Amino acid sequence: MYKQERYIFRAATEEDIRELAAIEKICFSENEACSYEEVKDRVEQAPEDFLIAFDQVNKKIAGYMSGIHSGSEVFLDEFFQNASLQEKGAKHCFLLGLEVRPEYQGKGLASQIMNRYIDMEEERGTEKIFLTCHTHFVPFYSGFGYEHLGKSPSTWGGESWE
C-alpha cells in the first residue's frame, strides 16, 4: 500500500482531459468507455465532480472518480454522454466511474478515492449517491455502505449492471 502523502487529491482541470480519457480507455471495455469528447464535456461542465489522485512521484494521474449531480432518483445512461444534464446544487450524485491505472490497483488507492469522494459529497450536502457496477464489484461497493438494489435498468455499453 502506498502512503497517502504520495498523492495529491484534487478536482480535474482542462490539462487533465487527455490523460483522463486515456485512463478511461484502459479501465473500461471499448463499448463501456466514454469518448474523449464525453470526458472533455464533463470536465468542462463540472471539474469539481472529478476527484483525481495525482501521483507526485511518477507525475501522473494514478486514478480518479467522477460523477454528475441531478435531482433524479434514476440512474440514466444519458449521464455518461450528456454533461448538460448536470444540475449544480442537486442533492443526488450519480457516480460515473472509478478508474485506477493497472499498476496502482491492489494497493488501496480505489478505496482512498472512494472514501474521499463520499466525504466530499457529504460536505456538499449531497443526500444520496447512486452507482451502477458489474456484479463482481458489488462486494467492494457494499463495503462503503452502498445498498445493493438489484439489477439496474442501465444497458450502458450493451452491458448488464447492478
Task: Go through the PLM ranges and name each one.
Residues 6-20:
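A short beta-loop-alpha structural element at the N-terminal edge
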Residues 72, 132, 142, 147-162:
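Conserved catalytic-core motifs of GNAT/GCN5-like acyltransferases
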Residues 87-88, 101-115, 124, 139, ...:
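Conserved glycine-rich acetyl-CoA-binding loop
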Residues 12, 96, 132-133:
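Small/polar loops that bind or transfer phosphate-bearing groups
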Residues 29-57, 64-85:
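Active-site rim helix/loop that mediates acceptor-substrate recognition in acyltransferases
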Residues 60-99, 105, 115, 155-162:
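Conserved acyl-donor/pantetheine-binding loop and adjacent beta-alpha core of acyl/acetyltransferases
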Residues 114, 119-134:
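Conserved GNAT acetyl-CoA-binding A-motif
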